[in-house]
Amino acid sequence: MCIRDSVRTTPFPRYNSIGIEEKRAVIEVLQDGYLSQFLGTWSKEFHGGPRVLKLEREWAEYFEVNHAVAMNSATSALYAALGAAKVGPADEVIVTPYTMTASVAGVLLYGATPVFSDIDPETYCLSARAIEKVLSPRTKAIVAVDLFGHPADFDEIFRIAQAHNLTIIEDAAQAPGGKYKGAWTGGLGHIGVFSLNYHKTIHCGEGGIAAVSYTHLRAHET
């Protein structure tokens, strides 16, 4: 970075987003002994400890989705979302070329073909007009990324998806708290994916959440 005709030669100071509240919360988990609720008995609260379940409930309530499923990373949440959409060999999934590799790697994981669609020069998100140019009879889903916290034109993307019976997976890793026409990001598609990675807006070191508003998709995901 140039400052008054000089070039900065030292790195910017490293920030620390871990405060007293976070430290207390971790200590409480260690003290209450509920490090896992994997007890070998099936129930609706089989996965995760009480605080994970609390996170899922509060996340779903805040972002106005039916279900929130906590995972170890947003990458895993993307993979689960593609699986819930029943993406498989011979399918095509439309993705943006301007994204993290996980958006494409998940498609390859299921033996499907990623098809790149151009971005909107104003938002750098998927262009609905460009999506229509790459549609084919094999198209199964669309992965739309809310790049830098800015959502794509979801009205138009939903119109295309409904016309062709496609699942929309919204990668909202960079966009918790954003809104599109009054609606929260992460709840704009059929499945939304959030990241809790250390470099994201809300973090726990590592983690991810899949937000689902369609019950039949959650059944596949879990």
Task: List each language-model region with its residue ranges.
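Conserved core segment of the aminotransferase class I/II
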Residues: 198-218
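PLP-dependent aminotransferase-like
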Residues: 83-172, 179
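Conserved SAM-binding loop
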Residues: 70, 95, 210
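Conserved active-site segment immediately N-terminal to the catalytic lysine
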Residues: 170-204
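Conserved small/polar residues in nucleotide/adenosyl-binding loops
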Residues: 1-5, 215-222
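Conserved PLP-binding active-site segment in aminotransferase class I/II-type PLP enzymes
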Residues: 4-75, 79-84, 88, 109, ...
